[in-house]
Amino acid sequence: TQQVSSAASDVYKRQAPAYFLNQSHGFNSVHGRMPSIATGAAMANHDLLYLGISGDGDSASIGIGQFVHCARRQLNMTYIVENNGTYGLTKGQFSATNDLESKSKYGDDNLFPSIDLPSMAIQLGASFVARSFSGDKDQLVPLLKAALSHKGFSFLDIISPCVTFNNHNTSTKSYDYIREHNDSLSKPDFVPSGKEITTDYPKGSSVEVPLHDGSLLSLEKLSEKYDPTNKITAIQNIQESQRDGKVLTGLLYVDPDAKDLRDILNVSDKPLNEMEQTDLCPGSE
């Protein structure tokens, strides 16, 4: 059984490595630096299966430089972004993936267009790119399995509910939360328990998912006729869905003949961490 090495780079993803502790090794890296850790580990031992967990505040901002080079180098790993369009630590500040037309829960306008990470991943050379919704298990689980089995850089953008800071009618990424204010010195937050939101709809169709506050999340699933090996078509479909105010989900792009970083660098078949010092540094002779 192939082991899994998991690196999570956000304080809110700190539990992620624990989910894979059966025949796996996991640790947390500095925020925005998960790709560096994964690259070093993967180059030292290519026999492991590498899974990295990130967020939109990480991969689209402080860690965007590392995300860019991790994708273009075709590191053999699965890179997951848990995307909710907001920063929790700064109480609902827009992240770079928040849509231009989306207002904050305080009524503030978003002044900048969003960064679409799947489009960027395709343009950078990622050989497997997909987007899904955390409430659509039937679609998400197969995509995760396919990403983990793909040779090369696999990227998954997963629209993930924020239960606290992005659940209001003017948000395009609305989620279940309630916040109560009072005039006392302390202003406690109250997050009620709610029923998990799931959906199931056919390929090639779209659906509006009602959220707990009455707002709607519009999803569109790729059809059977869609060709995921066409890079230009993939980017065009993503942009068209953005224009229509929809979130395109499914396998957006895949290169079945892609080379990974080890092939590009012509690294030895024997893992570097199993070599002797004389093999790693043979000297000038």
Map each language-model feature to its residues.
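Single conserved hydrophobic/aromatic residue that forms the stacking wall/gate
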Residues: 1-8, 12
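Short coil/turn segments at beta-strand junctions that form active-site/ligand-binding loops
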Residues: 6, 48, 152, 247
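Short beta-strand segments
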Residues: 10, 53-54, 78-83, 157-159, ...
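Short glycine-rich anion-binding loops that position phosphate/pyrophosphate groups of nucleotides
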Residues: 13-14, 57, 161, 256-257
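Thiamine diphosphate
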Residues: 14-86, 141-142
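N-terminal cationic-hydrophobic initiation segments that often serve targeting/anchoring roles
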Residues: 40-42, 71, 148, 239-243
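Glycine-rich ThDP/TPP pyrophosphate-binding loop and its adjacent helix/strand module
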Residues: 62, 66-77, 82, 86-228
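ATP/nucleoside-binding phosphotransfer catalytic cores, i.e., glycine-rich phosphate-binding loops
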Residues: 217-285
